[in-house]
Amino acid sequence: MALDKRIWMHFDLLPFVFIIPLLVVSFLLIFESSAVLSLKQGVYYAIGFLLFWVVFFIPFRKLDRWLFALYWACVILLALVDFMGSSKLGAQRWLVIPFTSITLQPSEPVKIAILLLLAHLIKINPPPFKGYDWGMFLKLSFYICLPAALILKQPDLGTALIVLIMGFGILLIVGLRTRVWLPLLIALIVASPIAYHFLHDYQKKRIADFLSEKPNYHVMQSIIAIGSGGFLGKSKEACTQTKFKFLPIATSDFIFAYFVERFGFLGAILLFAIYIGLSLHLFFYLFESNSDWFLKIVALGISILIFVYSSVNIAMTLGLAPVVGIPLPLFSYGGSSFITFMILFAILENLLAFRYIFGNNSKPSFGNFGFLAQLVRALGS
């Protein structure tokens, strides 16, 4: 049976104009580094796109009552990690699915659960003109801070910070009263030196390495790889930093350095443009004229995640941020982060494609082309 044509009228193709080049180039780099890893990455791509189409047809707007259940299920999984989690590299972050060798990292689906719950709560209680006051702020903060605290205990400082930045970034952008955000800012500044003393030794070492005049070995090799790429990059055979394994974790945490060694400064500029374009396109859904707060918050949350992940990862490889193990979104080797983002984009496309059913913009406004369409209209007027 043919699908209603309005579904495809509202389907936003532009994110995939940004995403597909990322996946193609990423696969090329991973294949050049290891054919075995590229085969695994191909499997992750297949799973990610399969889940995209499965999730795309889930009626999220009708599942309000289930969003709390999803959230608490993810929180329970995070809590179980502390009791029966699997340890890797000194961190206890995974659960082993019974009777299989498959592991699940609950900190990935919890990002989806937090974002959906925030979108639901903001939808039923939109921000007033002057922004949220303490009551609503504290209520929303609880749902952000609880899973972040459980993730921090694993320990996984990087992911915990990502959750906090996404959650509180949404609240700051949609609006908080001055008497809320100003005391919080002061408290954050005062508490930062105190919080440092509660960090693990390896986390303190990463900060010390970042602040020292000489970068640590990993960052130094990354900077050398980036500098050696020149303006147009090198052939595969000439990429000595990657070829001779000087560059650590070249296909995951430091894949940006590998990419710049291969494609040079010009390639880096194009990669920046893709991430900035994708982030802005999603961010500008916030300025649609309708009152579809569920859609706006989901798009805003994905925009923040894309921007923060890419900014922190690139800054890390340049020695401008501590090494925290944050992947380059839709680019680094691995399945967890990629599948999470594909599910998030599936949810966004579902909210766009089926919104005519709920009376939210029966005609597409600028969902198909985002801020680019707005720019074209402005230039033409």
Swiss-Prot record:
Catalysed reactions, as listed in the record: [GlcNAc-(1->4)-Mur2Ac(oyl-L-Ala-gamma-D-Glu-L-Lys-D-Ala-D-Ala)](n)-di-trans,octa-cis-undecaprenyl diphosphate + beta-D-GlcNAc-(1->4)-Mur2Ac(oyl-L-Ala-gamma-D-Glu-L-Lys-D-Ala-D-Ala)-di-trans,octa-cis-undecaprenyl diphosphate = [GlcNAc-(1->4)-Mur2Ac(oyl-L-Ala-gamma-D-Glu-L-Lys-D-Ala-D-Ala)](n+1)-di-trans,octa-cis-undecaprenyl diphosphate + di-trans,octa-cis-undecaprenyl diphosphate + H(+)
EC number of this enzyme: 2.4.99.28
Pfam family, one: FTSW_RODA_SPOVE
Matching InterPro entries: Cell_cycle_FtsW-rel_CS, FtsW/RodA, RodA/MrdB
Bilayer topology annotation: Multi-pass membrane protein
Subcellular location: Cell inner membrane
Gene Ontology terms: cellular component: cell division site; plasma membrane
Keyword Lyase: no
Pathway: Cell wall biogenesis; peptidoglycan biosynthesis
A Gene Ontology BP annotation from the UniProt entry: cell division
Name of the protein this chain belongs to: Peptidoglycan glycosyltransferase MrdB
Organism expressing this protein natively: Helicobacter pylori (strain J99 / ATCC 700824)
Lineage of the organism: Bacteria, Pseudomonadati, Campylobacterota, Epsilonproteobacteria, Campylobacterales
